[in-house]
Amino acid sequence: MWPGNAWRAALFWVPRGRRAQSALAQLRGILEGELEGIRGAGTWKSERVITSRQGPHIRVDGVSGGILNFCANNYLGLSSHPEVIQAGLQALEEFGAGLSSVRFICGTQSIHKNLEAKIARFHQREDAILYPSCYDANAGLFEALLTPEDAVLSDELNHASIIDGIRLCKAHKYRYRHLDMADLEAKLQEAQKHRLRLVATDGAFSMDGDIAPLQEICCLASRYGALVFMDECHATGFLGPTGRGTDELLGVMDQVTIINSTLGKALGGASGGYTTGPGPLVSLLRQRARPYLFSNSLPPAVVGCASKALDLLMGSNTIVQSMAAKTQRFRSKMEAAGFTISGASHPICPVMLGDARLASRMADDMLKRGIFVIGFSYPVVPKGKARIRVQISAVHSEEDIDRCVEAFVEVGRLHGALP
């Protein structure tokens, strides 16, 4: 007779490889169920393959003919600018493909320091620090800066990277209603017991195209002794008279404490993000921000492209000035046709449709007519608020914009979105 429970172990013994296969089969079943649920809800996100450079005119795999691109963050059209490309090639030749290191070991080159200094000058701040992306900048900031003694007050529609970054910190968390200054004031009053109070907001909200009321936010922050943080990914390079962003547009550059933004949209479109603000804060981030400490340095070619993009922007504001008229042309024509366009005076122009399947099907039919746009639905936007987000670029022509509107009208009528 076998001792103890050995006989039970023998009875239920399964070879290790078979147990692993069983676990994998279980995982596959769970994942397939999740994926089928996404498809069934009409929120499946497919990835179109572009076979050309980024720009207003592109080629898409499986689609014949040229395509007009109205869904890129390439606001200034600099991603394919010849001087930007040449600067990237020059940096690649001079500094190599990459650093194979994090910044504090052997991953800092002169071009990294030069770009950080240039970013600080551009935003009129004391210092700046580069990250692989603005998602990383947001992930690194709050945890390094805020302690359990502090509080962060966040707009409910802030970008996912801000929300995720705030989740990582140990500060007390308050969420105020979108753009609701009365609610923000109530939350600031409630947060008076904490050491530091940081108001966190997008400058321009990426899904709605609306702009934070920075003057009111800064006024409340001053009244209640709070700091102001702003994510400028959808503003840097093209909002404000010289493209400095939302704080320049609204005349509060000296009142916003911290700015996070990206090199991956208007400033060349490659990748990279940054924080700019007080010198001691940037120094602390170099010591404490985990995405900075544990991620490889930005590749030299990316740094070279972004640096040249900033040079072009600081040298002339002609490109910036062309944005407003083109944005207004699209918005006014679409609204005259009967569409509802969210936001105001921003090149992000969300065509509000409500139904996820409708947004997806209309986007597919737009592509058949040579217009590349994307339908956005839950969880990227709230349920019942699906939309097609159109983004205007400085390099779109008036003819491009008119062609896009004509296609929307045709497809809208086809799907019953217009009478």
Swiss-Prot record:
UniProt GO molecular function: glycine C-acetyltransferase activity; pyridoxal phosphate binding
CC annotations in GO: mitochondrial inner membrane; mitochondrion; nuclear speck; nucleoplasm; nucleus
Subcellular localization, as worded in the UniProt entry: Mitochondrion; Nucleus
An annotated GO BP: biosynthetic process
Positions where N6-acetyllysine occurs in the chain: 45, 187, 383
UniProt-listed Enzyme Commission number(s): 2.3.1.29
Residues annotated to bind pyridoxal 5'-phosphate: 134-135, 206, 262-265, 295-296
Modified residues (N6-succinyllysine): 45, 187, 326, 368, 383
Keywords for the protein's UniProt record, in alphabetical order: Acetylation, Acyltransferase, Mitochondrion, Nucleus, Pyridoxal phosphate, Transferase, Transit peptide
Pfam families: Aminotran_1_2
UniProt record similarity statement: Belongs to the class-II pyridoxal-phosphate-dependent aminotransferase family.
Protein name, as recorded: 2-amino-3-ketobutyrate coenzyme A ligase, mitochondrial
Organism of derivation: Homo sapiens
